[in-house]
Amino acid sequence: MADTLPTHAQAVIIGGGIHGCSVAYHLAKAGWSDVVLLERKQLTSGTTWHAAGLVGQLQGSHATTAFASYGVELLQEIEAETGQNPGFRQNGSISIAVNDQRLAELRRKADFASLFDVEASFMETAEIAKRWPLMN
């Protein structure tokens, strides 16, 4: 990190949140060496710090699902590459249908998951009650 700002740069990124850091990272990976990232406080100390950081990998389209899956892969690669733990944990999730329309959507998502190697399964009410008896 430089103590003074350079007079020129190939790219100047304003904001050291998740998006700004990602742009700087990807430019550097692409071979750019003249990149400046400006942040008024500490990296990821603003909105990024306050975010829950949830990454739902199954989205409504191929493009957004691929983007979310890439984000998960990237977090794993960054830890392997740098030795720094980004604090990312894969916990999974449960989605519950309260009507027939939502049930159809969840069935579609469970089928859709296999296209992206995202582990997903569809459970009927009886199986859920057996696995998690306290769930009402």
How does the language model describe each region?
Residues 3-19, 36:
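Beta1/beta-strand and adjacent pyrophosphate-binding region of the FAD-binding site
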Residues 3-6, 29, 88:
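Short, flexible hinge/linker loops that cap or flank conserved catalytic cores
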Residues 8-9, 32-33, 91, 118:
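Short coil/turn connectors at secondary-structure junctions
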Residues 17, 40-41, 99:
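Fold-independent oxyanion-binding glycine-rich loops
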Residues 27-28, 113:
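Hydrophobic alpha-helical packing residues
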Residues 28-49:
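Glycine-rich FAD pyrophosphate-binding loop
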Residues 53-134:
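Dinucleotide-binding Rossmann-like beta1-alpha1 core, especially the glycine-rich loop
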